[in-house]
Amino acid sequence: MNIFEELKARGLVFQTTDEEALVKALTEGQVSYYTGYDPTADSLHLGHLVAILTSRRLQLAGHKPYALVGGATGLIGDPSFKDAERSLQTKETVLEWSGKIKGQLSQFLDFENGANKAELVNNYDWFSQISFIDFLRDVGKYFTVNYMMSKDSVKKRIETGISYTEFAYQIMQGYDFYELNQKFNVTLQIGGSDQWGNMTAGTELLRRKADKTGHVMTVPLITDANGKKFGKSEGNAVWLDADKTSPYEMYQFWLNVMDEDAIRFLKIFTFLSLEEIAEIEKAFDAARHERLAQKTLAKEVVTLVHGEEAFKQALNITEQLFAGNIKNLSAAELKQGLSNVPNYQVQDEDNLNIVEILVSSSISPSKRQAREDVQNGAIYLNGERIQDLDYTLTEDDKIDGQLTVIRRGKKKYAVLTY
């Protein structure tokens, strides 16, 4: 099975400009290819991971990746299938975010070794050197307004309004392909299926300005079995930066993937062979309740993104919280595992009697209810049941001197911080 056949078997090929010519190029020699990443936030997220891992698969097959950071296009904003104009960022912010993208990409692509080591390029390097007049003369003349208006990404914004700034974005992305082709002989661009219009602007410019053929391959935008956009947890993006989404939170995200999606996601997001995945699927179908596919998915992706130690920690937090063994975890681990739990900052003047603190932290709605909860054995302090109405919290109740975990019943938690 050649690399293109494997990408197809994994569900990673959505659309290509000329499949036969692309397969020929990929099987006959080394292809230089690129994927663009606009610095629209200070971290990449799971939505980027499909293209990143596809790029890694191609590098492992011997092809040469170029990671293009959109230092210039990030200042403009891509209108593709966005309902409204993006907020413009400052040059300083875009520069800072561009630097963070390189660090994250180096976790997946090899920038150090071999003839096909990855290269990082920034389109600000060439756009900052070209004047507006030169851009119109040397690039703009190759694009008709009719051609630009025909793009679905533009059509969807015509009714609500699109600025010239965003309208011109596709020409800028097209020029990226031209520059990379002229400087590094890049002949293939990879991106999400929502980028098709911008990407083919590049092949059009290559054809008209340089009389060369470029290839485009889009990867699918991933949705779950319910058709919801993939990569968000509780409405928030799942980030690759551990400071924005902890390894534990990412582990939980994958662990909670629906059965209908689990095997498909193993093909897309892991480097397990298709044969290994087929074996997992057999065992998974025989005992869905054991969630083997989700557990494997969570292990593989968290290890890939954050490393083996982070995976082991996420697994340990999961197991200890499930068993109620709060004291087996450090304060740092509890902050990961209980990041979405209500937090109450204990004040110096607070009464630390168990009934008082239950009301202060909103675990119990009233003192009467708090007393009933304690007497009925529904209150746990760091995993241990408290039934003494006169119990007062002490230094011994502070884990690592930083926090105390209160639980009411089976599911209602609060974290007291000091």
From Swiss-Prot:
'KMSKS' region (motif): residue ranges: 229-233
Entry-linked Pfam families: SYY_C-terminal, tRNA-synt_1b
What Gene Ontology terms describe what this protein does at the molecular function level? ATP binding; RNA binding; tyrosine-tRNA ligase activity
- Where is motif 'HIGH' region found? 39-48
Q: Can you tell me which residues bind L-tyrosine?
A: Y34, Y169, Q173
Q: What class of enzyme is it?
A: ligase
Domain S4 RNA-binding intervals: 352-418
Gene3D superfamilies per record: HUPs (3.40.50.620), RNA-binding S4 domain (3.10.290.10), Tyrosyl-Transfer RNA Synthetase (1.10.240.10)
Q: Which UniProt keywords apply?
A: Aminoacyl-tRNA synthetase, ATP-binding, Cytoplasm, Ligase, Nucleotide-binding, Protein biosynthesis, RNA-binding
**Function of the protein:** Catalyzes the attachment of tyrosine to tRNA(Tyr) in a two-step reaction: tyrosine is first activated by ATP to form Tyr-AMP and then transferred to the acceptor end of tRNA(Tyr).
State the protein's name: Tyrosine--tRNA ligase
Q: What is the lineage of its organism?
A: Bacteria, Bacillati, Bacillota, Bacilli, Lactobacillales
